[in-house]
Amino acid sequence: MCGIVGLYLKNKKYNKDLGKFLTGMMNNMSTRGPDSAGFAIYSTERKKKYKYSICYNENNIKEIKKNLSKEIKDAKIKIISDHFVLETSLKPVKVISIIKSYDNLNLVGYGSSIEIFKQVGNPRDVVNNFSLKNFSGTHAIGHTRMATESAITTDGSHPYSTGEDECLVHNGSLSNHNNLRRTLKKKGIEI
């Protein structure tokens, strides 16, 4: 049992309230998935800029930030709870390679408009930890999870990044996950 919410705003005057709207929706779904939660926020596309949503598993974020800023000269880093968003004009192939060189960093999504955040814990706590109510954007998707067949981890939390400016949430187990995994790997998608 999980909860899925989504919101697409057709009127730009509400973009500043997207996080507030999604917070209420996530809170209402808390009982359907009390183990962990996550959300993806889409904002207006920033031409020639990419945003990388990264979860870090170490307390020394200042050192990580300093090192990344040396490797990615135009990096702007915004820390939010145990995640940060790195913005740069460098192409994804280069930045993803740099991020993967750090054992304590986990890339959870990237693109010119998407930011993804997820954590273990009650969804009410998760949305508060990330101050979701303060986010603005054009559309969003959220997920509350009740782990039934796998461990309760941030990696197991949704949304899952499926590519540049793409994400996926699902409700229930995928009985053909091994076939899907093999098919995706054959197409060059890293899992």
Range-by-range predicted roles:
Residues 1-191:
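Conserved short alpha-helical segments that host acidic/polar catalytic motifs at enzyme active sites
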